[in-house]
Amino acid sequence: MSEVAIGGAEGMFDPGVEIDRLIAEQIGWSWFDDHVLYTCGVVDFLVKKQLARIRAQATRIRLEADELCLAEGPAVWSVWQAVGDGSWAPRTMYASGSLSFVAAAHLGNALANQSRRRRAAHELQPRWVPARPGAAMVSERRVFFHNPGHTFSIYWSGLDMVDLIGPDRVEFRYRDLPGKPQALQVQSPWAILMFALAAHTQFPNHPLLLSGNWLPAGFEDKCHIAGKPCPHVRFPSP
C-alpha cells in the first residue's frame, strides 16, 4: 500500500501508524485492511464536509482546479462489449475430380463457412473484455484510469449505477458522450474507495450503504484488536 495519511499536524489520520503489526499479523491483517481503513477515514471527512483537511497524495496525473488526489494504485478493468461486428466472409471454392471428391470438398467448405458464421455470431455477443493492466487515480470527484494505450475518466456525477461486486472489485454503469450505455468492471485495491466516494456523493440510498454491508463484517472489531480506532462510518449519518 502506498503511504497515505489524512489531516494536518492536528487531527492526523494515518491508517498505518497506530497499528500493532505483530498483533495485526496474528489476526490476519493485510494490505486490504489498510485500504479499507483509509477509506473509512476518507468517508468520515467526506460526510463531515472536511475533505480540505485530507493530505493530498502525490500523482503524475494532471488534476483539475481544486481537485484532491486521494489515492493512486494499480487497476485492471474490463469493458462489457462485443469483440466482433457479426460480419463474416463466406469462402467459395471450385473442385474437380470424381463425384465423391467434389461432394466431399463442397461439404467441407460448407462446414467451414458454417463455423465462420457461428464464430461471427459468437463474437457479436457482449462479454467482459479485459484491457491491459494499468493504474487508477482516485479523487473526490472522479477516477482516472490509464494504461499504455488508453486514458479516460469516470466522474461520480456521471454514473447511472455503481456496485461493489467483490472486496476489490467495483462495477460502473454510465453513458459515453454519444449517450450509449457503457459498463465497466474494475479490480483494484482502491475499489472500495471508488465505491464509497461514488455511493456517498451520488447514491445515498444504495442498499450496500443502508445495510452497512459495504464494509467487511467485523471490520471495526478487527481494527480495535489491531490497536487502531476505526471511524464510525458503516451506516450513513442520520
Q: Each PLM stretch: what is its role?
A:
Residues E3-I27, W31, Y38, L63, ...:
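Acidic, Ser/Thr- and proline-rich intrinsically disordered linker/docking segments
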